Amino acid sequence: MPFRLTPQMKQRLTRRARDMIERSLQLFPELQGTIITVGYTRKHLGSATIVYRKGIAMRLIIRLKVRKLTYQTIGHELTHLIQGWAHGDRSRSRAADPAKVPSGETQCDIWTLARDPLFCDDPPTYIKMPRVVREHWPDYAAQVRKLCIAAIEKRHTHRLYIRWLEDELHKIAKIERPKIFQADQLLLPFVI
């Protein structure tokens, strides 16, 4: 999927960041056939904007902080584009179509995590969760993603699905932390 870089981003974009953006865009089929402008920001982790003229989306823009860039941030900003695009038609109610991603930061985090495990590399910013879950995110990421998927399913019948999700997150924090096997750094024997 093609994307355009702003002059500031051209100066700062690393190979790693370019690869991350390209890989993330592949997981957003809703954005196929559009050109996304990728800009640079210093203030926030990221931001997303849709420029409309006479009710037509003219430009889709995301701005990212290249330093400490995560898939979660890229996915979050791309999900904002989907939110804005879905709600661009102001003639109908925003809640009219349950298949659309609802507007809001917390909703954006939920839909981003549910989209693909790739976006679980860093804890979300807006979902309220216990400190232990945030601090030991790699141990909890898969469980949180499953809960986000369940929360989206619950949304059709349960109006307070975000509260349900946050309650479930508090429950998993009380259970002993799951141990995810990760290869430790290779230790070489010290020989004198």
Task: Locate predicted features.
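Short active-site segment of divalent metal-dependent hydrolases/proteases
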Residues: 75-83
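Zn2+-dependent metallopeptidase catalytic core
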Residues: 12-32
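Acidic/histidine-rich, surface-exposed loop or edge segments in extracytoplasmic proteins
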Residues: 2-7
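Long, well-structured alpha-helical subdomains associated
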Residues: 118-192
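Catalytic zinc-binding patch centered on the HExxH motif and its immediate surroundings
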Residues: 26, 32-59
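Post-HEXXH active-site segment of zinc metalloproteases
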Residues: 72, 84-118, 127
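Short pre-active-site segment immediately N-terminal to the catalytic Zn-binding motif
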Residues: 58-74, 98-100
